[in-house]
Amino acid sequence: MVQSGQITFYTHMYSPYCHRVHIALEEVQADYKAVTINVMEWPQWYNTKVNPITRKIPAITYGGPAAPPEDPSPEAVKLTESMVIVEFLADLFPGKLRPSDPVQLAYARLFVALFDTKVHEAFKGFFFMGTPASDLLDQLEGIQARLPETGFAVGEFSIADVAAAPFLARIMLLLENDIGKYPVGEGKKAFEELQKPKFARLMKYIADIKARSSFRASYDHAQVLFIWQNNPAIQRA
Ligand SMILES: N[C@@H](CCC(=O)N[C@@H](CS)C(=O)NCC(=O)O)C(=O)O
């Protein structure tokens, strides 16, 4: 299959889940229109007309006749859940994002699952609840242990890296700037820990991700920093 209809991508720069879809759209070089959702004044039309299932971003509409983003055609396919959309894009653009070898594909999906469970839990714990950094660092060490000596998570760039990149970028950004509910200084301390030789492979992986054109096209460091600095959910009391 190839893209045969319009793609409207509902997103916001702060969201790591939206960022996954953005990276995938850039990787496959889809023809798409991005629509930023005002997360401070969540639009009712989004919940009723685009994503009544989870009412979360990201979402896409695919196909159907031309229509304004806030009133998509009933004929357009509506999809939500970041990795469902990423896998859909991998189907629309065969040969990209998925390794052809079934074992490597299974490993890629396992990597995604680790991010959606353990890394995400540790991310929420440290930045949103102020739990000790050790759990986050342990999870990052576990991720590092799964990486091959060189290249991306399963060699070629794949769905695994699409899933991981937004979280790794935000983890580094938040730590370096000491943003989060943990005690002052704990973020910078964890950031320094990650600069030690022990984490060299993970840091190289993150550098490779950030150098990728799909990442550069989908990430504005200053803007994401500003948004997270002002995110009320992770401000210290
Ligand atoms: N499992 C979902 C998570 C999506 C998600 O949590 N989106 C957040 C933004 S990062 C959201 O829309 N939050 C708004 C809300 O919960 O009202 C995915 O993979 O897409």
Describe each region flagged by the PLM.
Residues 1-7, 217, 230-237:
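Eukaryotic N-terminal low-complexity, Ser/Thr- and Lys/Arg-rich leader segments
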Residues 201, 205-214, 224, 229, ...:
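Acidic, serine/threonine- and proline-rich low-complexity regulatory tracts
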Residues 103, 110-211:
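GST-like fold's C-terminal all-alpha helical module
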Residues 90, 167-168, 219:
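Active-site-flanking alpha-helical
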Residues 102, 217-226:
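Short, flexible loop/turn segments with low-complexity composition
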Residues 1-144, 148-149:
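GST-like domain detector, emphasizing the conserved glutathione-binding G-site
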